[in-house]
Amino acid sequence: MGKNDLVKTLRMNYLFDFYQTLLTEKQRNYMELFYLRDYSLSEIAETFDVSRQAVYDNIRRTGDLVEDYEAKLNLYEKFEQRRKIYDDMKQTLNDSKKLEQYINQLEELE
């Protein structure tokens, strides 16, 4: 698995965590098996007695759907921003002015 594949898989895992409740049961099952449990398309197809192409199409469409949700709701983007601010705060625990700036940034995200 290349670096880009790993980055995409990590992003899809996060997007799935944020938006899985908006998906159908079939979409959740396919995404969970493919991205979280690392099943191959063939293994998923065999499990659900469908073609590899059907699984691929469903995963691709569902990936597009969660990306669309993210474009509208920005839950993952805000999560990443908060995580970066928290990391920065940990580095500046002795600098109260910096900490105040970071707290203000967090408040603006909400």
From Swiss-Prot:
Signal sequence extent: none
Pfam families named in the record: UPF0122 (PF04297)
Cross-referenced HAMAP family: UPF0122
Family: Belongs to the UPF0122 family.
Job of this protein: Might take part in the signal recognition particle (SRP) pathway. This is inferred from the conservation of its genetic proximity to ftsY/ffh. May be a regulatory protein.
Name listed for the protein in its UniProt record: UPF0122 protein SH1678
Native species: Staphylococcus haemolyticus (strain JCSC1435)
